[in-house]
Amino acid sequence: KPHRRRIQCVFRDFQDGKTLTADLLMKQPEMDSICIATPWKENQKAFYYNQKVNCMPVKGKVNFDGRDYIFDGRKDMAVLDWGRGVWTYDNIWRWGTCSTRLNGVPFGFNLGYGFSDRSSATENVIFYDGRAHKLQEVVFMIGQDDKGNFNYMDPWTISSSDGRFEGIFEPILDRKAKIDMKVIASDQHQVFGHLTGTAVLDDGTELKMRDVI
């Protein structure tokens, strides 16, 4: 159907020989989204074209180990991350997203940097009640040990250069994966957690975030 996306999955041997299944239907809401096309300084033929759609109502079911996890389209949300491009060989990318409700109003954000040259455009944005509120540069401050390794499970500080997005991120899970095929490698840390802080809309309205996921 138009403006809908369906995800169906059968993942055999997901964990301990057990199968995970999923059937989820996401609806694209009538609201703003963020879309950027950015180059790389070191290679003008490389580019990244990307769209993020937040606050998508999602309904359906995920089953694992005999237990059903039900998603209710009246309260549960998803995000669509869609990208295409010709990328350079070596990259670091920081990305954060959220879709929830604040005081009953759809709220979300998309934050990212490090992947392509963002000097001309960023993907940093707040979504509130269907409208996008653009942010300037954002940085994730993650603690490190004495060897320079990131402590991903320690609290992070997230801050925007315009002062309109400030928060403390408390991790609860680090889904990490390191794949090395010699000619290509990937070192991923997909960290889930709670964020507490403030987000300021274009008209100066300050929104309080408390333990949003």
Predicted features by range, described:
Residues 1-213:
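Structured soluble/peripheral alpha/beta segments that form catalytic or ligand/cofactor-binding pockets
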